[in-house]
Amino acid sequence: MATSAAVRDDEPATKFAKDQLKSIIERIERLEEEKKAISDDIRDVYAESKGNGYDVKALRTIVRMRKQDPNERAEAETILETYMQALGMI
């Protein structure tokens, strides 16, 4: 049941909103495709490094550590060392 206050599809504001929504969705889809391509490239680099004899787990750890703030990383390393000492691991 339509009401007199219903918005018509051919009104300029409705067309603008539809076009804008379509543009947003298409941008998101394009970025998702780019993200997948980048993810595939990263996986290929790790595979290449493994083929060259590097430890992928260590490389991932280094990449993650380099993203951290130096002070936060130092604090985390200190805590880890403290726990390891308490457990007799070092």
Curated annotation (Swiss-Prot):
Disulfide bonds: none annotated. It comes from the Bacteria. One of its GO terms (molecular function) is DNA binding. This is UPF0335 protein bsl7135. It comes from Bradyrhizobium diazoefficiens (strain JCM 10833 / BCRC 13528 / IAM 13628 / NBRC 14792 / USDA 110). The lineage of its organism: Bacteria, Pseudomonadati, Pseudomonadota, Alphaproteobacteria, Hyphomicrobiales. Belongs to the UPF0335 family.
